A protein has these predicted regions:
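Conserved N-terminal structural module of periplasmic/extracytoplasmic solute-binding proteins
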Residues: 1-81, 97, 232, 281, ...
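Extracytoplasmic/periplasmic solute-binding protein
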Residues: 115-119, 124, 150-202, 248
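Hinge/lid segment of periplasmic solute-binding proteins
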Residues: 77-128, 180, 184-186, 270-273
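Short, solvent-exposed loop/beta-turn-alpha elements that line the ligand-binding surface or hinge
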Residues: 91-105, 168, 172-175, 190-215, ...
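Extracytoplasmic/periplasmic substrate-recognition and gating elements
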Residues: 37, 42, 46, 136, ...
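A structural signal for short loop-to-beta-strand junctions that line the ligand-binding cleft
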Residues: 64, 71-72, 98-133, 164-166, ...
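C-terminal capping/gating helix-and-loop segments adjacent to ligand/active sites or protein-protein/ligand interfaces
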Residues: 118, 353-414
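Glycine-centered hinge/linker elements that transmit conformational signals in sensory
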Residues: 153-154, 199-233
Length: 422
């Protein structure tokens, strides 16, 4: 894309450079468009925001980087994403946005170079409708490990006709939802294997905890609103609709889903860790981390790089920008809802997202957050193969079909790591 050098000889606005942000989060598109306009009005610097469709970010980024007007601000998901794009990542170690981080842990490093800046910290687990749980005769305090969760879920299933609801929302394996299982749920066996082996990355996963992965997947799909054979066509929106309508008690998702489900009422919402039956999991918290790192395109013009770094600094420090990013209801200048993110920046605002505050409470209570190790999964192909195998298994739950999940997980990891040169 565009070459190095200044934009001398162009009109005054060109000298300021411009920003092209390729946004990863479709659910925040409207807010980013509004912030871009505000920044442009304040500074005269043009900011273009393009949002990739769900699950299409890498494909879109590759396509856009091949154009003459390519993104100046893009994102990677962590070490694996960085490996593909490190030649495009400018060093951000001297930038204001880097200085605004509360911890080095939120910077993505490539040797000594700061290649990416984490801009949102998120947590996920099992979101719970406490009102329905109480109607079934239980409270959150009754669920401290996998055995407890299984007992409660199976009891709800046994009484579903009497209760009028199910234990879990549909575990949709359509492209809008399958990431919750092939990536987020799959993080748990990876996390526990890394913990057991004292590592934070590997070219060859052993699959030590895949029996645990199977038992939580079995629990999800056999105690839900939907016949497991129908999961391939179930969407993320289906799961939201089921949860909001009070058709299920439990819904695996994260803090980012708050605005989708807030109509259930804060007093009725809780969040549980994803228990998979590992010793000591009573001390486990939610899965907390980031796979959202901002990177600045090193191949953009100097003026555009400077403009982009200035835009990032504004996002991390400006009151209006931070309110839009951290706030929820009515937080945008237009009166629309904000993004509801937690940022790792010094000026982060306290959230009015209940799920974020629940995540913070787990930490305050001394529970150990589960780190996001799915950023070390070797490729999208690996995730897709695991997802396909999970879907096949759901429709016919045989040991032979689970062996296909194990094969995709273990052999697929080695194959994809080798292919990526990781």
């Amino acid at each position: 894309c565009g070459g190095k050098g200044t934009s001398g000889g162009k009109d005054a606005s060109a000298d300021k450079g411009s920003v092209y942000y390729l946004n990863f989060k479709p659910e925040a598109d409207a807010q980013w468009q509004e912030l871009a306009k505000i920044y442009e009005e304040e500074t005269g610097v043009k900011v273009t925001v393009v949002t990739a469709a769900s699950g299409q970010y890498e494909t879109t980024l590759k396509s856009e980087m091949g154009k003459s007007e390519c993104p100046t601000l893009f994102q990677v998901n962590g070490p694996v994403g960085l490996a593909s794009w490190k030649d495009y990542c400018a060093d951000l170690s001297d930038t204001e946005v880097y200085k605004q981080l509360t911890s080095e842990d939120f910077a993505l490093k490539d040797g000594d170079k700061v290649a990416g800046i984490g801009y949102v910290i998120e947590s996920y687990g099992i979101i719970c409708n406490k009102k329905l749980l109480a109607e079934a005769g239980y409270s959150m305090d009754d669920i401290k490990n996998f055995a407890d969760l299984k007992k409660v879920a199976e009891d709800i299933t046994a009484r579903r006709d009497e209760l009028g609801f199910d234990a879990f929302t549909s575990a949709g394996m359509d492209g809008s939802s399958d990431w919750r299982y092939k990536t987020h749920l799959a993080n748990l066996p990876v996390y526990y294997e890394y913990q057991a082996d004292g590592i934070n990355n590997t070219k060859a996963i052993k699959g030590t905890y895949l029996d645990n992965y199977r038992q939580i997947w079995d629990l999800y799909i056999n105690n839900s609103t939907t016949d497991p054979k129908q999961l391939s066509v179930k969407t993320g929106d289906d799961a939201v609709a089921e949860f909001v309508a009070g058709k299920a008690v439990f819904y695996q998702n994260g803090t980012w889903a708050y605005s989708d489900i807030s109509s259930v009422g804060d007093e009725n919402l809780g969040m549980l860790p994803i228990y998979i039956g590992v010793d000591g999991e009573e001390n486990q918290g939610l899965c907390t981390g980031t796979e959202n790192y901002w990177c600045v395109n090193a191949k953009a013009s100097e003026a555009d790089i400077k403009a982009t770094e200035d835009f990032m600094a504004w996002l991390a420090t400006d009151d209006t920008a931070l309110k839009a990013i951290c706030g929820s209801q009515g937080a945008m200048p237009s009166g629309a809802d904000g993004m509801g993110f937690v940022t790792p920046f010094k000026k982060n605002l306290e959230s009015d997202n209940l799920l974020v505050n629940i995540a913070s409470q787990y930490v305050a209570d001394g529970k150990t957050p589960v780190s996001w190790n799915f950023t070390t999964m070797p490729s999208e192909t690996w995730k897709n193969e695991v997802g396909s195998a999970l879907t096949v298994y759901a429709s016919d739950q045989t040991d032979a079909n689970w062996d296909l999940v194990k094969k995709a997980f273990v052999e697929g990891w080695a194959t994809e790591s080798q292919a990526a040169g990781n």
